[in-house]
């Protein structure tokens, strides 16, 4: 249901620090759309739409 920072760092082959920035950015977009977000996690469907569409 959610990807964690560690999973995103592994998939994108980036540092954990960069993965946190990506997650924060995606969660900021979700908040603007009215969704409740969880720090350090991003919904799998939303992540896949943004990175693998």
Question: Where do the language-model regions lie?
Answer:
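Amphipathic, hydrophobic secondary-structure cores in small proteins
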Residues: 1, 9-10
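Absolute protein N-terminus
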Residues: 1-2, 53
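A generic alpha-helix surface/boundary motif
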Residues: 2-3, 41
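Short Gly/charged-rich anion-binding patches and loops
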Residues: 3-4, 25
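Residues within the helices of the helix-turn-helix
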Residues: 5-6, 45
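Major-groove DNA-recognition helix of helix-turn-helix-type DNA-binding domains
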Residues: 11-48, 52
